[in-house]
Amino acid sequence: MLLRCIQAENRKLRRSVIWILFLAVPAISAVYGTFNYNMNLGILKNGWYDLWTQYTLFYALFFFAPLIGVYASYLWRLEHLGHNWNLIMTAPVHPFCLFLAKYCVVAKMALLTQGWMLLLFLLGGRFGAGLEGFPPPEIITWLLRGAVGSLAIIALQLLLSLVIRSFALPILLALGGSIVGLLAASKNIGLLWPYALMILGMNSNKTEDVMAGSLIGFFISCLAFTAGFLLLANLILAKRDVKT
């Protein structure tokens, strides 16, 4: 049943305008990052690592979480129209199964977004910044860690879009959460704030790995926040009734 729900959610993305944002938002970060790198060659001497700091300056700190918010709001949009919630609550599928399906689809989109960012980073470094060779393997590790950190954000954004009918408000909350996440990460308390997990995982705006020696705590925090938000979503859906 979960597989069928996932297939239904995937169909919502066909020919969707969401793909324009999928392509454009990381591309904007890439163009800005490459430009900023070239404008500061006098002080940026670490090649691919310094280019990474410029790419993640806006992508990880401000763009990624709102983009996840767009994915989540878009997948809940149909359910919030008219009396579609009544159809869901009376369907032979547990509503939480629908939530999990949306979670899987947004997680897939987040992973694809990270892959697109990696391709942009490679192309921008080779042809835009004139760097030789290929990015160091740590970059791929940081991208994958960022994807893991995004799992808690995905669960939270889907939860917000579940309880908030507005399309834009959860996205604005994601932006605000990212700003607070930046402050939390700078104060070394990022593991206590879900929006900071992706920033920490991506090693955003850093050349040295800030998570060295803290990976266990990072993964525990990701798991705890994700499980907590999923549990809360299940409780909310279990108490939701048909609206007249």
Residue positions per predicted region:
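Membrane-helix interface segments
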Residues: 17-19, 82, 94-96, 100, ...
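Terminal transmembrane helical anchor/hairpin motif
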Residues: 32-52, 171, 175-244
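Transmembrane helix-loop junction
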Residues: 78, 91, 122-126, 162, ...
